[in-house]
Every structure is written in structure tokens, then in C-alpha cells.
């Protein structure tokens, strides 16, 4: 019996990191399993502790040409003094999982024709095994080309900073022009990992994965030419860069079979078209109690309808990733009387809501977002303009791209935050009114719809992303018969 042609995938620990892998695999298999070679995808999941119920639900719903294996869980004893920041922590979990991953790949090669290993950016250490098994090393880069461009440039920028005596990466007073990027950045808007001391574990972990990125065979990019074509082209022209394959947008097609039965979706059914501001900060992002209060007061004062997915606050903005958070009722942190005063104006949903269905709903008029790349792609493909309130990682770069170049977002004006970095209630009101009421908001909405149309064209037959996916499949197909 002829062996299946297999693609192995290694996401990072965490529910939010798994979704792009599942959606990419579904798209790839649907696109390419009618060309004489039948691909199969196996997802090998590194874990720390028991997988979440949401992770298990996603994996149990995989189609028949996909399967998964949980690698043995890494225990706290193995971690010794575990890093508190999620980036070095994820990197360490993957490193400790390498022996188990090697066993899993050995098993796959005995049963299938294994042609590629696809990792997350922060699972890139797993690609050390690709050469050992003589297969393609690939990174599924779930952020955009602008972020990728910075990641590829970062080792050189770091080297140029070797003469700095104060442990700072860059001159904080000057804008930064990253080679290949179509927009300049303030230093504060670059990924927050570079703002750690250069001697820190967080900085070193990020530098290590950026150095490894230039050595992989293929970077699969969740973007498309109409969105970031100039930057994609700049990377593709670099002789030292890996082969870049822009196949986006990759988004979830639905949040779950029960989504339309939820109260928040039923509530949307009773709201006027384009009237509701949706607020959510991603699967792992959190805001401080002070910022939560300012947003709440701003929403109330704006008078606009809102649907707010609320989690307990934290001073650590990335606290939802790999860190055990409190199980408090998030509604308890709202200002006194807020829910009663806004009963006819908005709805607050604790912890989770079906984002795809909300963004696709005709009543949703704008999205106050942390500017995580996946959430932004979901917003753009559904034609929903963004209010940018970035929290961490590359989100400030994304916010700059969306506001300054792509014009699909508005952001509280520079200087609108107070001395503690909090965007005040007055500024929340101001930016809500700009996007929901002004001519400026209408222009942003129009531009978002244009990019939505371009996104659908990119993934259609013979679109730019469709053709890029075909090119990738051909590489893997030829490997299977080599």
C-alpha cells in the first residue's frame, strides 16, 4: 500500500497559537488533495500541564485527513526556575519536548512519506530535527510581512548596537526605518521584546529565534499581496532570506456550532446595522484595572452601543499566555453601577464570545482591538474598521501599519495616554466618535471594505495567495517523489 504524504506541524503551546495551524492545514488540504498526491497533516502539540478544553475541542473536530498527538507534558519540575515571560517559557517547553518530538517523527516516517516540518516562530527549535529527517524546514509565521521583515532584520540591528554601553537597543529619540518595511516606526512601537535589557533572557530568546528564522527553507506568511505587497516583495528579493510564501488571510471560518445560539449573537440581532462597537483583546491579552475603568467610562459617555468581551484585569498585558490567571468574575471589576446604567446601551460578556460570528454580523460597526494579527485579519476580511489599542509583542507595529499606511484603523492620538500609559475616558470617547460618526471614520470603513474584497480575490482560484499555496504544494509534492 502506498504511503501517505505527510506534513508534520509543531505549534506553540496555547490555544491561540493552534488556530492558525489548523486553519492553514485545512486550506492546504482542500486546495491540494486533487492533484495526484494525497497529503495528510499531523499536528504534534507541545504541552505544559493538561491541554485546555478549547484546545481539545479544536483538535477533536479535525477532518479525516488530519490528526494530532499531544507530546508528553513538560512538568514544573522539568522547568526548574521557569521564566515568567511567555516567550522564553514557550521556547523552553519546545526545547524540552525535542526528544518526544524526535520519537513522533520517527514513528511518522515508518508509516508515511514525511516531506516537511512546519513550526511556529517560537517553536523554531523543533526545526533542528528537519535536517536530521531530510525534510523541508518551514515556519508558519502567523503575523504579517512587516513583523517578519523586522524579525529578519533584528540580528543585524542588534549587531549594530554592540557599541551601546547602556544596554539599550536603539536611540529612543529617533524614528526607525526597517529595511524593506513601507512605514517608519517610533522605537516604542517596535516589538516589546526588544525593550528588555540586551542581557535579559527575554531579549536573548527573541534574538535566537530571529537568527534561526533566516536559516529555514520556507516561511509561510499569513498575509497577501494587496495588503503588504511592497514589503513581501522586498523580502523575496533578499538573497539571504528564506523562501516566503504569502498565502493569507488565514482565519477561522467559524467559532463553533453553538455560536449562533449564544446570548450575545441574539442581542446583535436586535441592534441597528453598523451600530455596535465590539471590544476584545484576544485570547491571551489583558488590560490593567485602571485601563478597564477608563474604557468602561468612555463607552458609557460615548452613548454608542457596545459588545465587550471582558476578562479579569492584570498589570501584565500578556498574562493570559501560559500563566495561570485568577478565576475571578470579570464583571466585579467594572465601575459601580456600570451594568445597570448601560443596560440598554451595551452587553458585557465574561471571558469569551464567538468573534467570527460577531465580526461577520451586520450590526457590528467597529472593533476596538489589541491588534493581534489574527484578530486584525478577521476584522479586515469582514470589512470591520479597527480602533487600535495594542498591548504587547508586535501589536504596536501592527497598529502603526493599520493606521499610517493601510488606513483601516484609528488610534488614540499620540500623547492621548496619561503619564502611566493609560488611555483616558475622554480619549476613548473621542476615538469612538471618530470611527462611528465622522467622515474620517467613513473613509476608514471604505478602505477596510476595499481590502476585504482584495482578501477574497487573493484566496480565490488564480489569486495571489492561491498561486503561492500551489507553489508550496509543488515543492512538497516533488519532495515526496525524490
Which stretches of residues belong to each language-model region?
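Glycosyltransferase specificity loop/lid
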Residues: 1-276, 280-482
Amino acid at each position: 500500500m502506498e504511503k501517505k504524504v505527510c506534513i508534520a506541524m509543531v505549534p506553540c503551546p496555547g490555544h491561540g497559537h493552534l488556530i492558525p495551524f489548523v486553519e492553514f492545514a485545512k486550506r492546504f488540504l482542500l486546495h491540494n488533495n486533487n492533484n495526484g498526491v494525497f497529503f495528510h497533516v499531523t499536528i504534534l502539540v507541545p504541552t505544559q500541564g493538561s491541554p485546555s478544553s478549547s484546545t481539545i475541542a479544536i483538535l477533536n473536530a479535525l477532518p479525516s485527513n488530519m490528526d494530532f498527538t499531544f507530546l508528553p507534558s513538560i512538568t514544573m519540575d522539568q522547568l526548574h526556575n521557569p521564566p515568567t515571560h511567555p516567550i522564553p517559557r514557550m521556547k523552553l517547553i519546545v526545547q524540552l519536548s525535542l526528544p518526544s518530538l524526535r520519537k513522533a517523527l520517527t514513528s511518522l516516517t515508518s508509516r508515511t512519506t514525511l516531506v516537511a516540518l512546519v513550526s511556529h516562530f517560537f517553536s523554531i527549535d523543533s526545526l533542528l530535527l528537519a535536517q536530521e529527517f531530510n525534510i523541508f524546514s518551514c515556519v508558519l509565521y502567523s503575523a504579517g510581512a512587516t513583523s517578519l521583515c523586522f524579525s529578519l532584520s533584528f540580528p543585524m540591528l542588534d549587531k549594530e548596537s554592540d557599541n551601546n554601553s547602556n544596554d539599550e537597543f536603539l536611540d529612543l529619540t529617533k524614528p526607525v526605518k526597517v529595511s524593506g518595511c513601507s512605514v517608519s516606526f517610533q522605537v516604542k512601537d517596535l516589538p516589546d521584546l526588544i525593550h528588555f535589557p540586551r542581557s535579559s533572557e527575554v531579549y536573548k530568546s527573541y534574538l535566537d529565534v530571529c537568527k534561526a528564522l533566516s536559516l529555514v527553507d520556507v516561511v509561510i506568511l499569513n498575509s497577501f499581496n494587496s495588503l503588504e505587497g511592497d514589503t513581501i516583495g522586498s523580502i523575496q528579493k533578499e538573497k539571504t532570506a528564506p523562501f516566503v510564501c504569502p498565502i493569507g488571510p488565514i482565519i477561522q471560518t467559524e467559532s463553533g456550532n453553538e455560536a449562533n445560539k449564544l446570548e450575545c449573537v441574539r442581542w446583535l440581532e436586535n441592534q441597528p446595522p453598523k451600530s455596535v462597537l465590539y471590544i476584545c483583546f484576544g485570547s491571551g491579552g489583558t488590560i490593567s484595572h485602571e485601563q478597564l475603568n477608563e474604557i468602561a467610562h468612555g463607552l458609557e459617555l460615548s452613548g454608542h452601543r457596545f459588545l465587550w468581551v471582558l476578562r479579569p484585569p492584570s498589570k501584565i498585558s500578556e498574562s493570559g499566555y501560559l500563566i495561570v490567571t485568577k478565576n475571578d468574575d470579570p464583571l466585579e471589576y467594572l465601575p459601580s453601577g456600570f451594568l445597570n446604567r448601560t443596560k440598554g446601551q451595551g452587553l458585557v460578556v465574561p471571558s469569551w464570545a464567538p468573534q467570527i460570528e460577531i465580526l461577520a454580523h451586520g450590526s457590528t460597526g467597529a472593533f476596538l482591538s489589541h491588534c493581534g494579527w489574527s484578530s486584525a485579519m478577521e476584522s479586515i476580511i469582514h470589512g470591520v474598521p479597527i480602533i487600535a489599542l495594542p498591548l504587547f509583542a508586535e501589536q504596536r507595529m501592527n497598529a502603526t501599519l493599520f493606521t499610517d499606511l493601510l488606513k483601516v484603523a484609528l488610534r488614540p492620538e499620540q500623547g492621548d495616554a496619561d503619564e502611566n500609559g493609560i488611555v483616558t475616558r475622554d480619549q476613548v470617547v473621542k476615538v469612538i466618535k471618530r470611527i462611528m460618526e465622522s467622515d474620517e471614520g467613513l473613509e476608514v470603513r471604505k478602505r477596510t471594505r476595499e481590502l476585504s474584497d482584495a482578501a477574497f480575490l487573493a484566496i480565490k482560484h488564480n489569486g495571489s495567495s492561491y498561486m503561492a499555496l500551489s507553489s508550496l504544494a509543488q515543492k512538497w509534492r516533488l519532495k515526496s517523489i525524490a
